[in-house]
């Protein structure tokens, strides 16, 4: 079991205004620790962040509602299933993410994803075969009639990984095909750009839209020659639905 509490404070000043963002973080995780060959596997985590973005000193900001921008970000991730003889896993991965904004804007955005998959690990092979089913839900701001997270994606995405140790430590081969939809939050944008302010185009910012990765395919090989020369070659191609 893992439990953490944290605080994030970002206080900035530029030529237009000074503002501050303060957030409290909570993280909780439980997972299976079973030495048996066959058992029920679980690994689940919960993350929550409550943040308040100050308005700063701009004249237009002084007319905004008290409390500036309040953010609530909740993320749950879990993997559950059966392990058979420590080499086969029949799993279901769950991912639920919700962001609720209040005061300056009133909007809620959420993504739900479920990924059934089979994992095989024996001998030279480590293989994962799965497919992610993802759904998006959001509401428009009732005051300004805009929607932060608009991109819906395609619902079904691949989740396939193949790793083969053809000649262990000398020639290893990897291939993968993945995809998915990711919710971009105000707090993550603020961590990337400390000077970002809610009035710097928040309602029309593509940076806050969902990121839709339609597919990401690639592979590679690595190893060594005679224990003296190391090599690692990778290749891939990714296509985004809203980039």
Feature locations, PLM:
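Exposed, low-structure sequence patches enriched in small/polar residues
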Residues: 126, 144-145, 149-243
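Transmembrane beta-strands of outer-membrane beta-barrel pores
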Residues: 5-11, 48-54, 96-104, 120-124, ...
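Residues on the lipid-exposed face of transmembrane beta-strands in outer-membrane beta-barrel proteins
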Residues: 1, 26-34, 76-86, 114-122, ...
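Repeated loop/turn-to-beta-strand initiation elements of outer-membrane beta-barrel proteins
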Residues: 2, 35-43, 85-92, 122-129, ...
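Flexible loop and strand-edge segments within Gram-negative outer membrane beta-barrel domains
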Residues: 2-77, 101-104, 196
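Extended beta-sheet lipid-handling architectures
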Residues: 3, 94, 111-113, 126-130, ...
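Eukaryotic alpha-helical scaffold "rod" segments
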Residues: 67-111, 116-118
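Residues that define the transmembrane beta-barrel architecture of outer-membrane proteins
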Residues: 20-26, 68-76, 106-112, 152-158, ...
């Amino acid at each position: 079991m893992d439990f953490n509490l944290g605080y994030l404070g970002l206080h900035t000043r530029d030529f237009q205004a000074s503002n501050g963002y303060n957030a409290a973080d909570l993280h909780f995780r439980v997972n299976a620790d079973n030495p048996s060959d066959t058992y029920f596997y679980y690994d689940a985590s919960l993350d929550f962040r409550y943040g308040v973005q100050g308005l700063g000193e701009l004249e237009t900001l002084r007319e905004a509602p008290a409390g500036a921008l309040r953010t609530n970000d909740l993320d749950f991730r879990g993997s559950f299933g059966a392990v058979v003889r420590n080499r086969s896993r029949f799993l279901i991965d769950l991912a639920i993410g919700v962001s609720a904004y209040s005061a300056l804007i009133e909007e809620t955005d959420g993504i739900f994803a479920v990924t059934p998959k089979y994992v095989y690990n024996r001998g030279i092979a480590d293989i994962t075969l799965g497919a992610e089913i993802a759904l998006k839900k959001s509401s428009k701001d009732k005051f300004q009639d805009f929607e932060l997270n608009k991109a819906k994606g395609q619902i079904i995405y691949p989740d396939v990984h193949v790793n083969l140790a053809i000649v262990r430590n000398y020639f290893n081969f990897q291939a993968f095909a993945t995809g998915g939809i990711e919710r971009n939050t105000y707090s993550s944008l603020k961590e990337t750009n400390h000077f970002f302010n809610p009035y710097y185009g928040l309602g029309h910012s593509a940076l806050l839209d969902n990121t839709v990765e339609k597919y990401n395919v690639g592979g590679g090989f690595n190893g060594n020659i005679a224990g003296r020369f190391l090599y690692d070659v990778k290749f891939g191609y990714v296509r985004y639905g809203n980039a």
